Amino acid sequence: ETAHLIIDVQKTYLESKENQKENEEWQPFFNRMKDIVIPNIKSLISFTREKKIENIFARIACHKESGLDRSLSQKKPGFNYLLLPKDTPSGQIVDELKPDPDDIVVMKTTDSALTGTNLRLILRNMGIKNVVCTGIFTDQCVSSTVRSLVDESFNVIVIEDCCAAATDELHKHELEIINMIYCHVVNLEEAK
């Protein structure tokens, strides 16, 4: 009845930025990912596999090399602009969390892992009622996915120390917004 959904933990988000100033601005995010989020998600994946709980991965990827099939938010200039053709190395899940051959991986071109994918149908077909969400970015794809799941009558848990946003402030603020309205926010220790 429960599945673990890992959202957008892709190589592109851990790559160095083009200039030093941008790298410095993103360093707290990189540190949180390396020191907390990725190790915690890895631990949770091991735990869920032991308990025979499904791990499902969502990743941003477009089918066409040109990106023609991307959503408007990914085509517009700015922070969300993203061109990640499905076979691009930087668009793959990070090596530390590499899906097993039998794990489901959905590709999306929207913030929500439900919009524009068959994830909703997959969850229903598998008899899933509860979804544990982890990944990035808390204030974008994680939040959008949580809201979509709740709208589709799934029970949702977000694991705080298995998620990250561009800044800790954004991360904490978004968790305050979605907690108890759309989901229950817990830490990894509480979830196990």
Q: Where do the model's predicted regions map?
A:
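Active-site-adjacent betaalpha module
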Residues: E1-A3, K17, S46-K51, H63-S66, ...
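N-terminal nucleotide-binding beta1-loop-alpha1 segment
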Residues: A3, I7-V9
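Short acidic, Gly/Ser-rich segments with clustered Asp/Glu that frequently serve as metal-coordination loops
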Residues: Q10-S16
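Short glycine-rich, polar/acidic loop-and-turn segments at beta strand-coil junctions
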Residues: K11, M33, R59-C62
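A short alpha/beta connector and helix-capping loop motif
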Residues: K17-T48, I53-E54
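A structural signal for short, well-ordered beta-strand segments and their strand-loop junctions
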Residues: I56-A58, V132
